[in-house]
Amino acid sequence: MKHILLLTTGGTIASRPTDEGLAPEMDGEDLARRIPFLTDSYTVTVRDILHLDSSNIQPEEWQLIARAVYAERAGYDGIVVTHGTDTMAYTASVLSFMLRGIPIPVVLTGSQLPIEHPLTDALENLRIAFAMACSGAAGVFVAFDRKVILGCRAVKVRTKDFDAFESVNWPLVGDVDAGGLHINAAALPPRTGGDCVLRSELC
């Protein structure tokens, strides 16, 4: 059975309405309770590391996320990171370079509507993210709207559409249809053969 780590950082996916608008108030355990497909296919451990609107993510938070992934890489088959969409592509790209040689899938995902919203895209995005995290494909990826994108090639191009991200100058790593997730092996990053090296210094 696969063992997946869910790292939560806040973002719209974990947000609730407040007097000042949406705020990422939901913790990881509360988020996980709203994911109906967390079944016997894999076990999930949840860890909260941030509760931020992703527009407030700074390099210090990138370092925190990278260190958390690095510290847990040997204990899990894959890691899913929930994140706000505003800076998700930046975080995915930075992690791709900070975690060179990561031997497991690290999959960032989020949503355009909170998970408690009746029309949320969160569950579909999480389903893709967990499928990718169970795939054994090493690297950092973004899973969103039936697509899996190499982390260093993801760009947010649409502010409000569910189809928010595109892959720039690189084929999709994966796509989803009625038959499930299909991975394009030719689009995966090459395996380095050595252990992952954490490059935590950004300047």
What are these regions, as identified by a protein language model?
Residues 10-11, 80, 129, 146:
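Buried hydrophobic positions in well-ordered alpha/beta secondary-structure cores of metabolic enzymes
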Residues 2-3, 7-11, 34-38, 150-203:
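Accessory alpha-helical/coil subdomains and C-terminal extensions
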Residues 15-16, 87-92, 122-126:
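Short glycine/serine/threonine-rich phosphate/pyrophosphate-binding segments
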Residues 9-12, 83-84, 109:
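Glycine-rich beta-strand-to-loop/alpha-helix junction loops that act as flexible
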Residues 81-104:
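Short Gly/Thr/Asp-enriched flexible loops that form oxyanion-binding sites at enzyme active sites
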Residues 108-178:
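Internal gly/pro-rich beta-alpha loop/helix module
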Residues 73-78:
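Short acidic/histidine-rich motifs immediately flanking catalytic phosphotransfer sites
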Residues 1-70:
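ATP/NTP phosphate-donor binding region
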